[in-house]
Structures are given as structure tokens and as C-alpha cells.
Amino acid sequence: MTNLNKKVRVGIIGSGNIGTDLLIKTMRSESLTCTIFAGRNFNSAGMKRANELGVHISDRGIQAILDDPSICDVVFDATSAQAHIEHWRELEPLDKTVIDMTPAKVGGFCIPAINAEEILASGNRNINMVTCGGQSSIPIANAISSVHPEFEYIEVASSIASRSAGPATRANLDEYIDTTEKALKQFTGAQRTKAILILNPAVPPIDMQTTIYAKIDRPNIAAIDAAVREMVERLKRYVPGYQLVLPPTLDGNRVVTTVKVMGNGDYLPQYAGNLDIINCAAIAVTEMISSLRYGK
């Protein structure tokens, strides 16, 4: 088999919404293939879907990979922040690249539109995808900081459909806030950051929406607008449903920008843009790994 025909073999731990949507996206990728889908319950919706697709499944979680390390090259950990810490201890000696879908922040933060090439070049084998709110807000915050690197405070508020927040999301809310705020500081240089997550119970469910507030002294709105629009186009390359709803607008001493994310509807409903954006980001960086290995 030539390099052009080779695909990066992906193992997925976690058969919930995130894991199952990752499975569908992996199977549709020209450069990735899923060789093991591991959860805890063969009767879960995700396991049943994987079985229907002919994917090798296991109800032994991470143990399925530990028992046969050769089964995959890259591992998506779609479990929980607490579980990931233990998973990494077990996977690190196996020389696997692990894409962490949880807010455990064990590895380096990755926002594909900003630093995918940099983090892959660093050789970091634990790649943290931050959070859904981080993936939607940090690119905009980073674009603003490219124009005004001196701003002191940034706040991001993400509103998501309550139906899209599964047990792992709800259990990791404290970790979500902490990880999002730390990543905001890293990618903007802001002295102070604040992250808010709102679970909206509205029916019909709302699309994910994120508003970014940046406190800037004498902001150059025209330059900020140009930088933000360029960043939005960069994101659309791997998140087609990413939209600029409110362009950078001056509100007192704050610059306010709002974006919306509609999901692809691969496995999850379109309103679950919060899950879709972090999964699209994970697929994008893993496809870059494939490109580096096999030239495609």
C-alpha cells in the first residue's frame, strides 16, 4: 500500500454524543479510519450505530486499546476530564498521539485556525481541544488581540441548547470554565479573562451562540473588523456552520462580537453546534497528522 492510500487509524474512547459524532466524521474523512470504538455499554445508541457501520466495537473502554496497542495510531478521548488524566497515564507509554476532547488541560491547547501546525511541530502527543466555547470564542479573541495586543480584559459567554449538553458536559462545568479562561489568556495575552456557559432549555432548541466582550482603550474598529472577518473565513474551512452574527461593535469601552455555530448534522442535530465545532476541530488537526505522515 502506497502512502497515498494509507489512512491514520483512529481509536475512540467514549460512545456518547461526542464520540459517536467523531466516529461519523472519521468514517467520512478521506485520510482517517476508525479501527476501534470503545465504550461501556453495547446497548448504547453510539455502540449500536458503530456496529451498524461495521466498526470494531468494545465495551471495555480504554482497556480495549491497552490490550492491543497496535490497533490504532491516534486516540480520541471523549470521556471526562477526570477520566482523561488516568487514561493519559496509561496511553503515554504506548507512544500514541491522544486528542483530548475533555477540559482536562493535560496537553497543549489546540485551536486549528491558530496553532495546529505549531503544536504538531512541537511533538506534543497530548493535544487538548480546549472546550466548545473555547473553539468558538478564542479565534475571535485572538484576531482582536492581533490588532490590540495590550487589552486587559476579555469575557466570553456561550449559550447552548440544554438538550445538547450530555452528562459529561454537565459534570465538567467547573473544568470547562477554568480551561476556557486559561486558553483565552494563552491565545490573547489578556491579563484577565472570564468564561460563561449558559444551558438554554428553550424548545425548539437554539443554535450555539457566543459573544466576545473585549475591554480596549481607543479600539481601531476597522482593523479589528478586518482581522475578525479573516479569522471567520479561516474557521469556515473546517467548521462550515460558523457564522459572524454581530461584527465587532463599540459598546462604551468594550468591543462586542457575536458568532453562531450550526452543526453539520452528521450524527447530532444541527442545533448542537457546540459539539460539532470541537469535533470538527479535532478532525481537522488529525487530518493534518495524516498529511504529515502520508502526504495527503
Swiss-Prot record:
Pathway of action: Aromatic compound metabolism; 3-phenylpropanoate degradation
Keyword field: Aromatic hydrocarbons catabolism, NAD, Oxidoreductase
GO terms of biological process kind: 3-phenylpropionate catabolic process
Active site: 132
Broad class of enzyme this protein falls into: oxidoreductase
Family of the protein in this entry: Belongs to the acetaldehyde dehydrogenase family.
Protein name: Acetaldehyde dehydrogenase
Organism field: Pectobacterium atrosepticum (strain SCRI 1043 / ATCC BAA-672)
Gene name, Swiss-Prot/TrEMBL: mhpF
